[in-house]
UniProtKB/Swiss-Prot annotation:
One GO location term (cellular component): cytoplasm
Residue runs in coiled coils: none
Binding site for S-adenosyl-L-methionine: H204, D243, L244, D271, A272, N292
MF GO annotations: tRNA (guanine(37)-N1)-methyltransferase activity; tRNA methyltransferase activity
Quaternary structure and interacting proteins, as annotated: Monomer.
Protein name as catalogued: tRNA (guanine(37)-N(1))-methyltransferase
């Protein structure tokens, strides 16, 4: 059974009809709507041969007059309404998506209700037991969703370096170039050539809302720009965006032009590590790093470890705030947040500062979650810019006990800033969508170059 047979739904039903005066129709519709015949694209109120009266069809559960509830019986009697039996004709168009698939699929095959909408495209992930009926499911989705032109199914897992996957068109046109509006920006791209996930729309804006106008953003795995373009358009940030996929870069450039952001977004097509190194070599003081490649993002933290922890040469920029998305598997004895932090620390070879923010973005599979961890990259060296003013600048740094002050001098090249980072506070952290979010003990740290402004990071 691979083709949807619409003729199966051609049928005639016997229902009760009421001949109602025109002046009573509106009142009847409001008071007794639940008793009227309800079906997609079916009009339960129709004209009659008498211009002063309308026919109102009752729901098919009221098969005879004795089935009519007392309240409706009273209304019928008081207004001298005639009750008759009528035949109505129904076809495929009069049945909902769920009704169609309940009719056509075996009882032990579930109906897919969860799918992603990308412009005119609907993307489904069918289960094994649904695959023999994939074309029926695809056609039903196409027919029952307005403005949808293409229905496709993912074939296999995301296993390419560009995060793309093989697809199969189940119904509709083979047009995979979609255009959508998200977070005040227009995005256009070929869904087969790039990575896009509409389910992350809220998370895209959640992170962008932590940025300020003066921030400079380094987006290492930018895709077609779901973080980069809103950061530039809504927050007016300067953005350096990169992706290894030439198709992503092509569409990101087009999208930047469409949204008039060419002067705010500089786009590269490099390996992510080379991209970061190029910005550092140019002394571009990016303040936030976005790392949205959950399967391998954490591995790329080594580029920051080499710049801020392993190098003997002071970096030309201050340590940025890292916003890293990653997948974390949850075993019975483990904790998502603790495991995420541990995975980060294993790569950077240092403790994550105590003012980190870490929470679960969404479940992606049983015992596997997409996480976001935000922290300032620790360092053991002052950046070059701080050395030029060290002899004349005094930076008070108050410890947790409020008893000590550290003064910067030209001999501070060996000063450890990691220890001050661990005293920073994470205030006003909300519980987003009842998911875990963690920040540790408060302190009075005031060194702006070493602490994360959590009022900037999270909504109060």
């Amino acid at each position: 059974m691979n083709v949807l047979n619409k003729e199966v739904f051609n049928q005639t039903k016997k229902v009760l009809g009421l001949i109602v005066s025109n002046k009573l129709v509106n009142g009847f519709s409001k008071q007794f709507k639940s008793y009227m015949f309800q079906s997609p694209k079916f009009k339960p109120i129709v004209s009659t041969d008498n211009d002063d009266k309308k026919m109102i069809y009752l729901c098919d559960t009221l098969k005879k007059e004795t089935d009519i509830p007392d309240q409706l019986k009273t209304f019928i009697k008081e207004n001298d309404i005639k009750v008759i039996e009528k035949d109505i004709s129904l076809n495929y168009n009069n049945f909902s998506y769920e009704q169609v698939l309940k009719t056509l699929l075996p009882k032990d095959v579930g109906i897919p209700f969860s799918f992603e909408r990308i412009g005119h495209i609907i993307h489904v992930n069918l289960k094994d037991e649904q695959l023999p009926f994939k074309y029926i499911i695809g056609q039903a989705i196409l027919d029952k969703n307005i403005q949808v032109k293409t229905v496709l199914n993912k074939v296999g897992e995301i296993d390419t370096v560009f995060r793309t996957f093989k697809i199969e068109i189940l119904a509709g046109e083979p047009d995979l170039v979609a255009e959508i509006k998200e977070n005040e920006c227009i995005f256009r791209f070929n869904f087969e050539e790039v990575y896009w996930n509409s389910r992350l729309q809220y998370e895209h804006m959640e992170l962008v809302n932590t940025f300020k106008k003066e921030d400079i953003i380094c987006d290492m795995f930018a895709g077609v720009g779901p973080f980069a373009l809103p950061a530039a358009k809504i927050k007016k940030c300067k953005v350096y965006a990169n992706d290894l996929n030439p198709s992503s870069v092509k569409y990101m450039k087009e999208n930047a032009k469409t949204n008039r952001l060419e002067s705010k977004v500089e786009i590269s097509n490099l390996d992510a590590r080379d991209f970061v190194k190029s910005l550092v070599e140019k002394s571009i003081p990016f303040t936030h790093v976005v790392m949205n490649l959950p399967s391998t993002s954490i591995e790329f933290l080594d580029v920051f470890r080499d710049i801020f922890l392993n190098s003997t040469i002071p970096p030309p920029i201050p340590p940025p705030i890292i916003n890293c998305y990653t997948f974390t598997k949850l075993d019975e004895s483990s904790d998502l947040i603790k495991d995420t932090i541990k995975n980060v620390e294993n790569v950077i070879g240092a403790k994550v500062p105590s003012d980190y923010v870490c929470y679960e973005v969404r479940d992606v599979a049983p015992k596997k979650s997409m996480m976001r961890i935000t922290f300032r990259m620790p360092t053991i060296l002052p950046y070059v810019g701080s050395l030029t003013t060290a002899s004349t600048t005094t930076t008070p740094t108050t410890s947790n006990t409020n008893t000590s002050t550290t003064t910067s001098t030209t001999s501070t090249s060996t000063t450890t800033t990691e220890s001050t980072n661990t005293n920073n506070s994470a205030n006003n952290v909300e519980d987003k969508n009842n998911k875990k979010r963690n920040s540790t003990e408060d302190s009075n740290e005031t060194n702006e170059t070493d602490s994360i402004d959590t009022n900037k990071k999270l909504k109060n």
